Amino acid sequence: MKKLVLIMVGLFLLTTANAQDKAALKAQKAAKKAAEKTLKEVRNIYEMSIPNPQYGRKETNFDKLETALPLVQTITESEYTKDNPQAWKLATDIQIQYFTKIENESKADPDNEEIKKKYIDSSSKLLNYCIKYDSLLALDTKVKPEEKVKEHKTYQTRGVNAAVPLLQAAQNYSNSDKQDELKLGVLYAEQFIATMDKSGLMKDFTHQELAGWKTYAKAFRAQAYLDIKGTPEDKIVSSYEELFDSNFKGIAYQSLSNYYRETDKAKQNKYLQAGIEALKDDAEQKDLRANFVTILMQNQFQGGDVEGFKKTAEIMKTEYADNDNTVNAYLMEGQIAFEAKDYDTAKNIFLAGNEKYPDEPKCLLMAARSAWMKAQANGSKKPDMEEAIKLFKQIEAANPNDPELWGESLYVLYNNTQQPKLAANYKKYYKATK
């Protein structure tokens, strides 16, 4: 009896399971049928909304087409139609109508910010639809190869037309002073880059400006990242390093140099040095390279990197002799020798600087002071003192209205060389309190 009960229970469970399976299968069939019906409904709405001379429609009926929008969301999300290429083709074709409409509105009113945002949103959505349709079409075995090629080219063109406004938006937003807009700059730049580099839609796209477009997008992204508060260091660095092989390399090295200016001199110098090397043969960025050399030279001088400084200063002196900052190479190099108490070398460096840049009084002044220090170090021998006097007299001749450069020094030097009559001419400049 117990065995019979168990058999009856087993049969009951099997019957219940079969009933549930049948109910589930029936529900699935109903859902699939409903999804396919929705797909047909969307197609009918689309075809009855777009211009068609046969039915006397010269323009798109957007009031009618709008009724398809919630249905488009249904067919692109339903598990029964979301992998159907035709669902995404319809979504794309409908979006093209709105994209074209908003594009025309944007051209008619280019300063309208609300229309601009709608245009960019429409562009982004259209591009995503084109990519999705193209990817599903490639897997559809029912479509002939030649038809696939034709469709691919058609929707590739539409995708490009949608991508270009995203590049323009990335440029605009990356120059904003608003954090939310800077983030949009990154978003649209990355969408453009990913589309061109990774999507099947663009795998065979060729255009003479394509490489330039991608470089611009990367530059806009880097600029936005730099200005967004809290952007991780690695994102900023990597985004600019991607530009090292482009025509934006100068800006990239400059931006990274500035990024580390206050926080890490070693890293700043690293990018300055790399920038100097990268721009070595770039005539168009000669001034920027000279700026790199100037900053690196100053950093090395202030940081005590004497050997590094000398190499950089040599670049400045030999390659940028006409640059206003080159005189500093002589002044700093002379200062290094002066502080090392190599006064003769210091004097010669300062004199070389004075010969090339006579309008900079510091060169001759430091040469004179070096000569005086040499004299003091050698026991104040008269020939050495006379050399210092000669240089201070040159300063007086060149700067007669600036006695603070030479007056007191000549008074002391003449006194120390037992020339009281000459010293008397400069006594008025002597500060007895010193």
Feature locations, PLM:
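Bacterial Sec-dependent N-terminal signal peptides
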Residues: 1-27, 353-354, 434
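Intrinsically disordered, low-complexity segments enriched in Gly and acidic/Ser/Thr residues
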Residues: 305, 310-311, 317-402
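Hydrophobic/aromatic packing residues within the alpha-helices of TPR/SEL1-like helical repeat arrays
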Residues: 65, 72, 127-130, 189, ...
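Residue-level detector of the short coil/turn that links helix A to helix B
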Residues: 63, 177-180, 229-231, 263-267, ...
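Amphipathic alpha-helical repeat scaffolds of TPR domains
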Residues: 26-53, 81-106, 139-177, 184-195, ...
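Canonical positions in the second alpha-helix
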Residues: 75, 133, 192, 242-243, ...
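Single-residue signature of alpha-solenoid repeat helices
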Residues: 68, 123-126, 185, 236, ...
